[in-house]
Amino acid sequence: MILEWYWLALIGFITLFLGVFAVWKTQFKGPEAGIKPRMSDFARQAVTKAAEEHKIKLDFSADSIASIDKILEVFCRRHRAEPIAEKELSRIVLTWGAYVGTTLIKHHGGEWQRDSLVSGAYTYPIVFLKPITSNADKTIVRLSEAVPVMWCLKRIRHGFTESVAMRYKNVVKN
């Protein structure tokens, strides 16, 4: 009799937990929920800023990433002359990094995340799951990340040796 109550209580608890989880999942998507639309907004802003402020047309093609290096060189020179305030620098790298990342996702898949397993919190990586091997029993995947926002930050701080276009090509190649 006690054993029956135990199982009934356990089943009831599991059912309650699954119900609460289902409600939570539909109403609260967690910190990752708004990242994709925010990064899409930043990417659209990059296209507008490139045209208006730099007279460069961006079209979300892989070839357009070289233009991002040219734009970031302007910020690099400005930053060397007088350091850009951190808040403004964050906005700059989010805008241009979002464009690079959106282009990468468009052509090669992946998904925006807020935090990186490698680079840390608020670095906005793109996460890729790539199948390595597959057989009837299992598929082994490799998890990899690209951090275009951080690429843009390094490009501004360190100059042409931190080319965003080269990093993009390396990610695509691998």
Language model segments and positions:
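Core hydrophobic alpha-helical transmembrane segments of single-pass membrane proteins
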Residues: 10-19
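Extended, well-ordered protein cores
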Residues: 22-25, 170
